[in-house]
Each structure stands twice: as structure tokens, then as C-alpha cells.
Amino acid sequence: MRGEREFRKVRAHGAAVRDPLFTLRLTDYRPRYGERWHPRAIIGLVVSKKTLKHAVKRNRARRRVREALRTMPPELLPGGLPACRAILMLNPGVLTVPFPELQAALAQALQRGAGATKRGGAKGKGGKKGGGQVAGERAGNESGSGRVSAEVNPTSASPASPAEKS
């Protein structure tokens, strides 16, 4: 993954799968602007300085996970890696766990996450109960922000023509 914007989108809209070794956030695959449709797994690895203090350990953790994904046995993940955009936030346990266990944990998380990806925007967020506005309802001033949305009926929006009045 490239750029803060892609990471922000996955963090905001991605489904989370937690494991003692890492946290996986993933969304459905969508090509970048101007890119051809080529479904594949695009995974960004994140290791914070708070999690692993030394750069050598952070780099070793990244290399271990990258190699575990690259050499994933087909029996662990039939069909290969799912087409998705994902962020793997690594924990210190990645350095000490045996390699086959790391691969098994990654495969299990990817399988769980592939079925749980969220689609669309963040509709449930914003503080109002009940989610978004239902078609035909008028949104009141529930948030206290001073903004009111009014219902617009497309048939009554334009004045009646002289032919319709008679």
C-alpha cells in the first residue's frame, strides 16, 4: 500500500480481526484511480515504535511476516491470499512464535477477515441512533449543530406550467 490516504481508508472502513500476534484490518479490493482491475492482496505492514523499540526488531518482524505470507502453504489458505487491501499491525509476539504457528495464525485471520469485510462508508458513526436518514423522512435538528435538512419532492420543486393549471 502506498500513502497515508490508503492506510486511512482501510483503518476507517476495514473490518478488524484481532489475534495475540497482530491486528488485521481489511477491506475489499478496489483498484487505484487509473489502475486496471487486477484483484490481488495488497497488505501494508505496520510496526510502531511503542510496540517494538529497536529498529532491528521492527525490521525483523516485518521480514518474518512478509516471508510467512510469501511462503504460505496451500493447505493453510486454499485459493491463495484473498483479494483485499489490508493493514497488519504487528505485536512483539511475532518475533518469538514458531514460523508454522505464525503462518497458521495469518491464514486463519485472513479467512475470518475475508468474510467480514465492510462495504461502503461509515454509516453508523456520527452519534445519532438509528443510522442514516430513511428515504422520505425529514431530518430534524437532532445534533444541535444548527443545520436542518429539508425534504425535497422533485415533482413539486418546479412551478407548474400554464398548461398544467387548466
Swiss-Prot record:
Gene3D superfamilies: 3.30.230.10. The lineage of its organism: Bacteria, Thermotogati, Deinococcota, Deinococci, Deinococcales. Its EC number is 3.1.26.5. Residues 142-159 have a biased composition (Polar residues). Belongs to the RnpA family. The keyword tRNA processing applies. HAMAP family: RNase_P (MF_00227). SUPFAM superfamilies: Ribosomal protein S5 domain 2-like. RNaseP catalyzes the removal of the 5'-leader sequence from pre-tRNA to produce the mature 5'-terminus. It can also cleave other RNA substrates such as 4.5S RNA. The protein component plays an auxiliary but essential role in vivo by binding to the 5'-leader sequence and broadening the substrate specificity of the ribozyme. Consists of a catalytic RNA component (M1 or rnpB) and a protein subunit. This is Ribonuclease P protein component. It comes from Deinococcus radiodurans (strain ATCC 13939 / DSM 20539 / JCM 16871 / CCUG 27074 / LMG 4051 / NBRC 15346 / NCIMB 9279 / VKM B-1422 / R1). PANTHER family: RIBONUCLEASE P PROTEIN COMPONENT (PTHR33992:SF1). One of its GO terms (biological process) is tRNA 5'-leader removal. It catalyses: Endonucleolytic cleavage of RNA, removing 5'-extranucleotides from tRNA precursor. GO terms for molecular function: 3'-tRNA processing endoribonuclease activity; ribonuclease P activity; tRNA binding. GO terms for cellular component: ribonuclease P complex. InterPro entries: Ribosomal_Su5_D2-typ_SF, Ribsml_uS5_D2-typ_fold_subgr, RNase_P, RNase_P_CS. Keywords: Endonuclease, Hydrolase, Nuclease, RNA-binding, tRNA processing. It comes from the Bacteria. Residues 115-166 are annotated as: Disordered.
